[in-house]
UniProtKB/Swiss-Prot annotation:
Top class in the EC scheme: ligase
Family of this protein: Belongs to the D-alanine--D-alanine ligase family.
NCBIfam families in UniProt: D_ala_D_alaTIGR, PRK01966.1-2, PRK01966.1-4
Pathway given in the UniProt record: Cell wall biogenesis; peptidoglycan biosynthesis
Protein name (record): D-alanine--D-alanine ligase
Alphabetically ordered keywords of this record: ATP-binding, Cell shape, Cell wall biogenesis/degradation, Cytoplasm, Ligase, Magnesium, Manganese, Metal-binding, Nucleotide-binding, Peptidoglycan synthesis
Cofactors demanded by this protein: Mg(2+); Mn(2+)
Main location: cytoplasm
Organism: Staphylococcus aureus (strain MRSA252)
Encoding gene (name): ddl
Lineage: Bacteria, Bacillati, Bacillota, Bacilli, Bacillales
Domain ATP-grasp: 134-339
Amino acid sequence: MTKENICIVFGGKSAEHEVSILTAQNVLNAIDKDKYHVDIIYITNDGDWRKQNNITTEIKSTDELHLENGEALEISQLLKESSSGQPYDAVFPLLHGPNGEDGTIQGLFEVLDVPYVGNGVLSAASSMDKLVMKQLFEHRGLPQLPYISFLRSEYEKYEHNILKLVNDKLNYPVFVKPANLGSSIGISKCSNEVELKEGIKEAFQFDRKLVIEQGVNAREIEVAVLGNDYPEATWPGEVVKDVAFYDYKSKYKDGKVQLQIPADLDEDVQLTLRNMALEAFKATDCSGLVRADFFVTEDNQIYINETNAMPGFTAFSMYPKLWENMGLSYPELITKLIELAKERHQDKQKNKYKID
């Protein structure tokens, strides 16, 4: 059987660099190597692109994926053809954060006309920018918690007024978030104005724009969505925390988080969550995969928190686990995403790019 040619891209110039490498290790060890000829491209923290061809063995440590040595090649050379000498059937970007899931690298793949897994330019960019995402949800009529947003330059000029606005409009605790970052990096839970100032200072280290959201005493529920024009959603899962806040450290290092799949919710609430996840997917014109995150209060009030265009994708992450609960294994999910990438690219070929 002739193998399909796949290129996995990971690393990246982002604070989520190490998360991306961990994800790549998991995917490389699970992908069907009888079906796919797999090359990898590692993007260093400095932005250099380094390639390794034909991965056939188990990756036992993320250290094996730090391809720091070797010549940094031109991007167009790297993606022109696979090490088998044939064009790539699909590129699988496993990049998190800015320069990875914000539409920038998706734009590169579009220009090079390469099929790629996951969301397109618009959906990736709008899902990454928390303010734009919230505005799209609002337009779609999806319920959200109160929030405000402002720029670093505005805060430097109008700090007193902005702090007053937060105190007038929101109740503590509040969450301060960089607008364009994931994996809970740069996010702070603030219970008073002193903590608020520190949280703002922390968030502005990662982005020029931030969002401050009203805190709520609620369960954190997540739904996985898969597909292109006709997506499907899983039954919800719950993030059960042994910490006050589900931050980067508790997500990836401490093991203080457990996933309950499916979540213990009334069936009508679960159905509402599935439908809202599909609405959120459509609101940002997504394709491939999305994880929709919600808050559910004790009296079953539902608020959408965000969509994640490149959700955590290790074997133990919520997104693959939700699909595993639906009967789709991790290796099968990887194959399905590659098929969806090819399907979307084939559909794009129906477009006309010149007028006769």
